[in-house]
């Protein structure tokens, strides 16, 4: 969904009012008029203010304006208009406890390219800050509860960027479970279907003991986690668009 189709960011506009506008044929900012039925003068003024600020934000590539305006559950709407700023990332660790476990690899995918940082080599606070510096929008799977706080604890970095967490977003269309389960449901394949989080821990331990190929396999798994979030994101956004928007306003009607 293009940002210009959203009215949800205006103060006093919830999903009910937004849908009412869409059903009247007001499916784009350009089509909004103060005379729209069921809006009222105060709310109309707020919508116009949101649209004015939104246009400036789009011109400035400012994702944060909409991140502040939208409720958490609507952040998936940021993707279509700001996909070029999206940085997909995933971490591997030696366990779930942030205090007793360590981060072993971090993979970041942006602009069609993937970079992996490895513990003991180039995985440092400075390299992470540099990697995330130009990211306007973060995309993770369960990152709000795991990846982001883990990196904060391990490296002292605050990733306060606009952030789409795919796990709760997938639930909106009935997809539950971990990333691999979602991929399977969507028909997205893997080169390493037999590797999971537990195997990733074992691979790191083997690497520490000097086993040939263990690190390479771990990196491949981490990169696959990261890169596969792209088709998941694309599919989920498309389905949510089709569920929410009236037929004439859907992407295939543009």
Regions from the PLM with identified roles:
Residues 84-95, 222:
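Two-metal-ion RNase H-like nuclease active-site motif
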């Amino acid at each position: 969904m293009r940002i210009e189709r959203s009215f949800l960011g205006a103060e006093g506009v919830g999903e009910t009012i937004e849908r009412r506008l869409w059903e009247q044929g007001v499916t784009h900012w350009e089509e909004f008029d103060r005379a729209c039925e069921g809006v009222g003068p105060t709310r109309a003024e707020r919508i116009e203010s949101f649209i004015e600020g939104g246009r400036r934000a789009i011109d400035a590539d400012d994702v944060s304006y909409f991140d502040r305006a939208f409720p958490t559950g609507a952040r998936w709407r940021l993707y279509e208009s700001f996909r070029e700023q999206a940085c997909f990332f995933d971490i591997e660790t030696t366990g779930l406890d942030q205090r007793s476990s360590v981060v072993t690899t971090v993979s970041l995918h942006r602009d069609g390219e993937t970079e992996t940082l490895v513990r003991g080599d180039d995985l440092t606070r400075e390299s992470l800050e540099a990697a995330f510096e130009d990211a306007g929008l973060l995309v993770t799977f369960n990152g709000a509860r795991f990846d982001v706080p883990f990196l904060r604890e391990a490296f002292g970095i605050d990733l306060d960027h606009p952030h789409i967490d795919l796990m709760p977003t997938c639930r909106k269309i009935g997809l539950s479970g971990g990333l691999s389960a979602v991929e399977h449901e969507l028909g997205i394949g893997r080169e390493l279907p037999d590797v999971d989080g537990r195997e990733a821990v074992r691979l790191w331990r083997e690497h520490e003991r000097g086993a040939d190929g263990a690190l390479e396999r771990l990196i491949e798994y981490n990169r696959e986690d990261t890169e596969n979030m792209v088709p998941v994101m694309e599919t989920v956004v498309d389905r949510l668009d089709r569920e929410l928007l009236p037929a004439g306003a859907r992407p295939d009607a543009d």
